[in-house]
């Protein structure tokens, strides 16, 4: 199958947080707002001349400095971000939108603030730490609305003169929704028996939409969509099984590439930095202010296991089962970042519930942040692929009898 025209360019954009499009936007007077978590409402970080950059730590090798300030049994994703901050990799930012969702991420951003990782010449720079509720009722919506208004919108308005009006929020939602529509249309093609795009390629497209200014990446995404619409696919399928990947932070498309190299085509991506739920459209009505609707959407659509009330747990399990059905996956791979508190119990519970209650075959793994060409992970995925094939073979033989 022919390689996408802009794929190499997109891959190069993912080589550095301060990539070419980020530098271009800042040179034109735009403001880069860093964030790490779905719970920091992305669309509200793209008001006026602001643009969001979801932080990653590509090519991380050592985490020795970050481990000194945190702990060797804390989340490696958070330590990798702190390590890069200590190296000065995020000094291009104009603000950092943190969330008090998980302890490790919270500690990493607190260390960045204490040690002035933004540099000494940014008087208007601000850190914020949103207090995120554990559920999704209307009291929780009102709480997060107050948090966002006071900790993000107010300093953007007072420090940088950013328009935070209802009209500005609706304009940001329209731009956000166009990105979502493009990626959703591309993602829906993965339901086909022979998709015109691999899971790796789709992961690259989704990641550049998180890490680049929307106004600069949108023309390239539009062009890529048109290209994929007319792409000629190979007549023979080049995979053995189809899988959905569920879990925590996958900000490295090479992990998806590793899974696919074992014969498992990734057809659904329900993980942090994936398209579910982060690349689903936000529908706004005229009957209520945009800010409240945006806050409600993020609170009610989160897939984070931090929300531990029973109806939220069932919501997440049902959604995985729905994705497996819709994208005709043969199984699901649940992955978690090593030492992640919330996903450690979500993954273990799902490993029991999904096969028992939903009939979905599951591979459950915890992994380090730096995956590379992990032989152990490759072996486990290969074994999972073979187990699915054996199950299909037994079912076929049973039908013949």
Protein language model annotation of sequence segments:
Residues 27, 38-39, 44-56, 247-312, ...:
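Redox- and metal-dependent alpha/beta enzyme cores, enriched for Fe-S-associated oxidoreductases
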Residues 12-22, 26, 34-43, 62-66, ...:
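Metallocofactor- and cofactor-centric catalytic cores in central/energy metabolism, strongly enriched
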Residues 316-324, 329-331, 335-341, 346-401:
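TerminUS-proximal long segments
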Residues 69-87, 308-321:
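Glycine-rich, highly charged phosphate/nucleotide-binding loops
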Residues 1-31, 145, 153-281, 309:
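A charged, amphipathic alpha-helical module
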Residues 80-155:
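Acidic/His-rich segments in extracytoplasmic proteins that coordinate ligands and/or metal ions
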Residues 56-62, 132-133, 270-275, 368:
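Short, acidic/turn-prone active-site loops that include or flank metal/cofactor-
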